[in-house]
Amino acid sequence: MGKTMWARAVFLCFSVGTLLWQEVLTRRIPVDTGQCGLPKSQEDLNSFLWTVRRHPPAYLFGTIHVPYTRVWDFIPQNSKKAFHDSNSVYFELDLTDPYTISALANCQMLPQGENLQDVLPRDLYRRLKRHLEYVKHMMPHWMTPDQRGKGLYADYLFNAIAGNWERKRPVWVMLMVNSLTEADIRSRGVPVLDLYLAQEADRMKKKTGAVERVEEQCHPLNRLNLSQVLFALNQTLLQHESLRAGSFQAPYTTEDLIKHYNCGDLNAVIFSHDSSQLPNFINVTLPPHEQVTAQEIDIYFRQELIYKRNERMARRVIALLKENKDKSFFFAFGAGHFLGNNTVIDVLRQNGYEVEHTPAGQTFTAAKPKTNPTSDDSMATDSPAMKYFDHVPATASYFGESDEEMLPPHLLLPDSISQLEEFGKQNSWHRKHYRNQRPRQFNDLWVRLDDSTTTLPSNTRNTNGEQSAESLVWLPEQDHHNYLDVKLSHSQSNSSPKCLSASPAFLYTLVTLCLITTMRTRS
């Protein structure tokens, strides 16, 4: 009788383990996303709006590169009014210009006749190829029913993001890998905040422009030496392999960024991470020689992608303000450019401009556009400040810079602006678009690093190690909305719970404890 009971107990333990494992494979376990509720009053909202005191006024607005529906309801009404009442709206890049697309595509490519396999070490190339095969296999499972309902197809989406990857420079492949996460794929379907503002400005017939060029943004990345690029690509692959294996969780996630933007502290660290779009590779677990490489990359990125970029953007803002004294402006840049040290605001103040933070709930009277900006010939389009924005290479005389100064520019690195192709100005995608292989669009070229991380687990440091990655880490799923139906005055923001798959080790431990208890009972 005792043996029979013991056998039944053993069978029960294994049955429990099997059922738990099946639950993990077939169902997602909800985890609190930690998102905050919408405040009851405007005064309680975070404000990323600054006012440049002039007549008419100019505004600086800090954005983040996430789907706009996740943050729009948390943006104060006075920020939206400033956008609505401004004559001109300027961004970091012209998000809807075909020239941007072709220039970025050319910048990312290796020299003619070279392939990635010729540049990368064999082991690193093999790991990269295997990871991309894994992503391609998983993409149909990552996509949401809502995305499929809008006509997005996994094969098309993968090729749109990773197409021709073997011809790209290694540093751009690294950024591409960071954009091929489940969280990023599931966020496709709604334009990011920057792109939404650009589309709204276009719909409202406002004058739009940019303060940066693609050529400027590409050069800093392409000037990294090969050893630095290989180090960065290896670190990136290691962290994604660890995420696949369930042994690692990124400290900076899209959800963290959204929470800080909507209701958290104005933490310059996390917003700088979003604005530079590159991880900090410094890690205390690295050996000394790799620490040196990581520090060199960190210093280079910080100088080129944040400080120099802030300086250049501010000088071009100043040029626009001087050349168009009777026009009101709304400058929408990444929030990280306005927070911390050596910011765009600091440069403006150093040049005599009075810039004040505009709290949520503060009322002001903005100057409304006098005429239709698109037909207003009084805009100084032939001025030195405006010549820069023409589709021709800028010369030194445009901004009083030498050719040498024009070369080391600043970078709006890939982010979730990478949405124009799927969502652009069309209602939906159809399979025929993939079959016809139409020209690639802006979002194919921009990638995002929202879920990248600045640290690496010590047990995965081996640069030539082969990783086993069978268990998945489920990341947030977005409940998307058709942005064409959402007007400037209102949006909806829903997200389903963040989910994590249970670790196999945890399940086996549970079964083992059950067996031990059973054996003790038998004895």
Curated annotation (Swiss-Prot):
Extracellular side of membrane: 27-499
Stretches of the chain found on the membrane's Cytoplasmic side: 517-523
Leader peptide range in chain numbering: 1-26
UniProt cofactor(s): Mn(2+); Co(2+)
Residues spanning the membrane: 500-516
GO CC aspect terms: organelle membrane; plasma membrane
Principal location listed in the UniProt entry: membrane
Glycosylation site list: N225, N234, N283, N341
Record note on cofactor: Divalent metal cations. Mn(2+) or Co(2+).
GO BP terms: negative regulation of Wnt signaling pathway; proteolysis; Wnt signaling pathway
EC number: 3.4.-.-
GO molecular function: metal ion binding; metalloendopeptidase activity; Wnt-protein binding
Family named by the database record: Belongs to the TIKI family.
Protein's UniProt name: Metalloprotease TIKI2
Organism phylogeny: Eukaryota, Metazoa, Chordata, Craniata, Vertebrata
